Amino acid sequence: MITINSKEHILEQKYRPSSIDECILPAYDHETFKSLVSKGKLPHIILHSPSPGTGKTTVAKALCNDINAEMMFVNGSDCKIDFVRGPLTAFARSVSMEGKPKVIVIDEFDRSGLAESQRHLRTFMEEFSSNCSIIITANNIDGIIEPLRSRCRVIEFGRPTEEDKISMMKKMIHRMVEICKNENIEIADMKVVAALVKKNFPDFRRTIGQLDQYSSKGVLDAGILSIVTNDRGTVSDVIEAMKNKDIKQLRALAPKYAADYSWFIDKLVSECYDQVAPGKSIISLYEIAGENNKFHGLASNIELHVMYMLLQLTCELTWK
């Protein structure tokens, strides 16, 4: 069962997990957060992970939901000293009418220019700790001053074991399937879903974002799979033309591959490497391709630029 926020239309927001049980986490992290929830009240917490999209903000909100807290959510960049002294203090000082625990979530509080706010928050935490908890999310733990870290439970998460990775990807695939069912998105090829998850792991936010992007026509099929995996086949037609010194064919192929130069030159070098004679030809391959790549950004005509490289390779390479 997945949470659905019908007020949202962006899939990432519409299907944001609302509880720790729904969050896809490494086993140790899941147990840690469940233990915090079981106590009914939260300590001051810093959630940090260098990887984006691993669920820091989602976990912070889920913790609040699971203890039925009255939550105030603040973007870290807005949390200047005046905001701490004003709205944050007013919230922390007031008592919940329903007797709920109170939690302030400060998202991405590791941004530059917030040191003064962080210093003021030290005494803030001590003064209001009996009535209000603070959860801070951060990508860079060094962006949080040491005195603030010492007052919080610092939890680094998003470092799964190999066993965790397999389990988490399976859960994410299942979640993607549920989202597709609810959105009436046809999954013509399950490999697309698996490829999206594997490609973006552990950034599940990007995974959902790309699902949103690629499902705009209502179907996930083999065509989408080729885009996701960047599997555009081989450049064997170019290699055959070079082997045969077929200049006319190379001229016809140059426009086809010039559109995605970065992919083409990487693929060309990779496939040529396995087919050219060892020694001088391998050196020539890297010299010519490397020089061409170096000046790619300066070329006014990419098709001509690609054709020039192909002619050089045709003349210089010896094949097995």
Curated annotation (Swiss-Prot):
Tagged with keyword DNA-binding: yes
The protein's Enzyme Commission number: 3.6.4.-
Family from the record: Belongs to the Tevenvirinae sliding-clamp-loader large subunit family.
Enzyme class name: hydrolase
Function: Forms the sliding-clamp-loader together with the small subunit. Functions as an ATPase enzyme. The clamp loader holds the clamp in an open conformation and places it onto the DNA. 4 ATP molecules must bind to the sliding-clamp-loader before the latter can open the sliding clamp. ATP hydrolysis triggers the detachment of the sliding clamp from the sliding-clamp-loader, freeing the sliding clamp to track along DNA.
Species name: Escherichia phage RB69
Binding site for ATP: 12-15, 24, 53-58, 205
Gene it is expressed from: 44
Entry-linked InterPro entries: AAA+_ATPase, ATPase_AAA_core, DNA_Rep/Repair_Clamp_Loader, Gp44_C, Gp44_lid, P-loop_NTPase, T4_Clamp_Loader_L
Keywords: ATP-binding, DNA replication, DNA-binding, Hydrolase, Nucleotide-binding, Viral DNA replication
Superkingdom of origin organism: Viruses
Keyword rRNA processing included in the entry's annotation: no
Molecular function via GO: ATP binding; ATP hydrolysis activity; DNA binding; DNA clamp loader activity
GO BP field: DNA repair; DNA-templated DNA replication; viral DNA genome replication
Assembly, per entry: The sliding-clamp-loader consists of 4 large subunits and 1 small subunit. Interacts with the sliding clamp; this interaction allows the sliding-clamp-loader to open the sliding clamp. Part of the replicase complex that includes the DNA polymerase, the polymerase clamp, the clamp loader complex, the single-stranded DNA binding protein, the primase, the helicase and the helicase assembly factor.
Protein name: Sliding-clamp-loader large subunit
